[in-house]
Regions:
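C-terminal motif of bacterial Sec signal peptides marking the signal peptidase cleavage site
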Residues: 6-10
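Sec-dependent N-terminal signal peptides
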Residues: 1-3
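N-terminal intrinsically disordered, low-complexity segments enriched in P/E/S/T
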Residues: 11-151
Length: 151
């Protein structure tokens, strides 16, 4: 069974050097008529959490992920996570998956810019989705686009 610990203090996002991908942006469609963007530097400036977790599939092992929650990022862009009907995450490697409102309501979704107190590796950057206590298939790498369908 996966164990998740969420810390709001001491996550020390400033300790993670994102300089190699700080300016990379994630496109978000569905909040407004126009696509909005959030850079990794913008995300690092938000309230961040640190999660210690392990995927239920044990394919990845234990990680300590740091970044803002999806809810925090959306709030910074003027959207409420409770108004989402469906969300689709897209990776630069063409991997994608969707989550419906019931799953979103029941799980914390972390947009991690650091793993184990280190910047993301090239194959994971600029952002990795981490959903504690979930299968690693939901831990999308190289996030570059989020598509939101509002209620």
């Amino acid at each position: 069974m996966a164990v998740a610990i969420i810390c709001l203090c001491g996550c020390a996002p400033d300790d993670i050097d994102i300089s190699g991908y700080a300016d990379q942006q994630i496109a978000i469609d569905g909040i407004d008529e126009d696509t909005v963007f959030v850079s990794i530097a913008d995300m690092k400036a938000l309230d961040c959490v640190t999660i210690k977790t392990e995927s239920t599939s044990d394919k990845i092992g234990k990680v300590r992920a740091t970044g803002p929650t999806l809810e925090t990022v959306l709030a910074a862009k003027g959207a409420d996570i409770k108004d989402i009907k469906k969300i689709t995450f897209h990776g630069a490697d063409d991997y994608e998956y969707s989550l419906k409102e019931d799953y979103i309501a029941e799980h914390d979704i972390i947009l991690a810019f650091g793993i184990d107190k280190e910047p993301l590796d090239e194959e994971d950057a600029p952002c990795r989705i981490i959903i504690p206590e979930s299968d690693s298939a939901y831990w999308l790498r190289m996030l570059d686009h989020i598509n939101i369908e509002m209620k």
